[in-house]
Amino acid sequence: MSTAVTMLTDTWSRRAKRFEIEGYAKILAIGTATPANWVDQTTYPDFYFRITNSQHLLEHKEKFRRICNKSNIRKRHMVLTEELLKKNPNLCTYNDASLNTRQDILVSEVPKLGKEAAMKAIKVWGRPISEITHLVFCTTSGVDMPGADFQLTKLLGLNSSVKRLMMYQQGCNAGAAMLRLAKDLAENNKGARVLVVCSEVMLSVFRGPSLQQEDNLLAQCLFGDGSAAIIIGTDPRPGLETPLFELISAAQTIIPDTDSHLKLHVREMGLTFHCSKAVPTFITQNVEDCLVKAFEPYGISDWNSIFWVLHPGGNAIVEGVEETLGLAPEKLRASRDVLSEYGNLTSACVLFILDEVRKKSKKDEQ
């Protein structure tokens, strides 16, 4: 298990403008997208056990209902529809071979959803698409060659010379990792404009319930579909580009002896999910040490003096971090809002939260 910390400066705030430094990477635009289809978390247990032909598992269903009720998730967007599931019944069992079915859907839907977010970011940016020099694409599922980065290049009509990087199966830490990678690319390639796209369709983990693998219920409760795109570059051109955030530094820390507590494996049945009950505890016990290492060089030790873009791996993690660090309730409001409205969006989640922080900052400035 690893934690990633990216220090961002809100360039709308008067205080932050002191830190605008030539050559540092800046976020120039953000765009997000979700599938039109969505599910209500309160009624989802009924739908889930009906569509998977598992209504006879009454105790299991009630347990799932309790998990959903405690999740602080109101709704989730999904590519999966009842019609699609009825056409592909092998997706609704726990362990039927279904990888081919999943792949056929994912290799099409992941780039398409990514395009929606990218087009929104490009519109906000306001510059010609031909000025994009680099593309970094990230997704947890749908491994294929040519990859989703290549497909998106065609969908957007990017230059054939655009420098592409495809990152598969990096999980929830990938959102912050993409910021770190894009920062390095922008700061080491003068004039670069890096398009980062995180597109997640969690069809890969959808499956029927299992009495032997109860953490599968957590996956069925938690994950949603969505894509987010950002454009990053240095030295924005006055009057042509508007910086939203500045990326000051990035750090990543591995928590020892935790690799067995959170695992996803590709199998014939799709992507299996294992999460031990100790994960929130590991995070809350180690979060402050990670923050000290990241922020000490900048003289920051008051965790309420900074703004937060916390990946909400689950409600227990959000509450644990808040309590451990003594954070004021408003510090993690954006994380809670995104979790409530979309669920855990894996790599795209922190970018959705970053956009929420941007919207609130802009509103406060006005």
Curated annotation (Swiss-Prot):
It comes from the Eukaryota. InterPro entries: Chalcone/stilbene_synt_C, Chalcone/stilbene_synt_N, Chalcone/stilbene_synthase_AS, Polyketide_synthase_type-III, Thiolase-like. GO terms for biological process: flavonoid biosynthetic process; polyketide biosynthetic process. Its EC number is 2.3.1.74. The active site is at residue 172. The keyword Transferase applies. It catalyses: (E)-4-coumaroyl-CoA + 3 malonyl-CoA + 3 H(+) = 2',4,4',6'-tetrahydroxychalcone + 3 CO2 + 4 CoA. One of its GO terms (molecular function) is naringenin-chalcone synthase activity. Keywords: Acyltransferase, Flavonoid biosynthesis, Transferase. Pfam families: Chal_sti_synt_C, Chal_sti_synt_N. Pathway: Secondary metabolite biosynthesis; flavonoid biosynthesis. The primary product of this enzyme is 4,2',4',6'-tetrahydroxychalcone (also termed naringenin-chalcone or chalcone) which can under specific conditions spontaneously isomerize into naringenin. Belongs to the thiolase-like superfamily. Chalcone/stilbene synthases family. This is Chalcone synthase B.
